[in-house]
Amino acid sequence: MPRFSVIESLCRQDGICASVCPAHVIKGPKGKTPFMRPDRQDSCIACGQCMAFCPFGAARVDVLDPSDMLPLERSKLPDAESLSMLFQSRRSIRHFKKEPVARELLQHILDETRHAPSAKNRRAVRWIMVYEPEKMRAVGDCAVEGLKLGLQNPETGPVLAEAKALIKAWGRGLDPLFRGAPHLALAVAPIGQPLAREDAVIALTYLELAALPYKVGACWAGYITGIARQYEPMQRLLCLGPDAEVRGGQLLGPIGLRPTASAPRVPFATQR
């Protein structure tokens, strides 16, 4: 289990680490050196909250590397106007350039999602990156076979016409599944993990935003996600294993067409 400690020469005994610990693992009133509560030895979730909030770098959690910490430069944070522009400019990209994204860049973008929050800091989401054209084609072919099988299900009625159109378009050499995106990122999490789907959606949203500065566009891969949850051949192709499930996905690739304005939005209804 993770263990909390302090570097006493740096500690100012201000009680901040104890006050911000969400698991109430730390005891340390002002004027005294904080320590890990004996009755909470197995409760640390290694969230790093104590390390992030300590102004003097005194807090430590043994499973977390302090060299991985980034000093926060407030001047580099977006102001309200810039942040609003980012939110309003975000659009799903469905027109991609044909060239691939460098593997190193995709890995860097994926690495940014480490900072996405997760329930109780479980960090159960992992990634499957489909990179090569041959593998993308195999995933697409498998998805179409899954759609064909789904047409035999009497409960498929509401999506029958859509599935038929997808199958027909794929057979004609069109790409309704990937929309020309050269890559696919799938967020995978354990079956039965509480709030794992929500964790995956948050991580996928971080992924989309992290890609934008590099002119890498993203589009939610709803068809592939739905098929991967139900179609065993797809699960085998992705090497999922019996205890894991695809919780969401993003198509990724160099942006072909980008928006020039925000789209109008009807305000949310708010209950007061």
Segments the model singles out, each with a brief description of its role:
Residues 1-272:
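Acidic, surface-exposed loops and disordered segments
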